[in-house]
Amino acid sequence: ECLLSGTTCMNIGPGEVMQGLHSDDGLVTVPRPRMPFMVTTIWAFTDFTDENGATRVVPGSHKFDHEPDYSKQYDHIAAEMPAGSVMIINGGTWHSGGANSSEDDWRLGLSVQYCQGWMRQQQNQYYAIKPEDMREMPPRLAQLCGYTLYRGIMGHIDGASPGGFIGADAVDETAYSRIRATAD
């Protein structure tokens, strides 16, 4: 079970410098290396090329015992991919937006992060999306935004699922309860 943690649109224009390497789970206080607490997806809306700032990735960095030191340089690769592609990485993987050395080629992408169902999300989805708008969304989106219980109890409001407060009956069934039902 996971939650939608955050979304970020990234637009890297000509002349922009490389972003500092970072991990998306850098605020997690559990020592590294650690189990995956987050998953990051990076969607390419335009072609990602070495020249226009394709995302830089340090392969295997999710296994390192430290966060990147911004004063140091690290070997990295450019995650080149055509528009319409998606890259999926462990949230502990060091990555950054690359430098755009092109004359007129903008690199546009979307980063969507997911976290463990018991974690606090980066963006507060309860306030980011109005309840009346959430009522119109598919039940799975309501689940991803946190309008459900984690393992049947976490996230309750007076013992009830938060889905009831947006009139979403379908969000009450969690993956945990489905697994438990098939095990019995």
Identify what each model region corresponds to.
Residues 1-7:
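A short coil-to-beta-strand element that immediately follows conserved catalytic motifs
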Residues 3, 35-37, 104-106:
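A short, structural micro-pattern
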Residues 7-10, 92-94:
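Generic short beta-strand segments
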Residues 64, 68-88, 92-93, 98-184:
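Conserved double-stranded beta-helix
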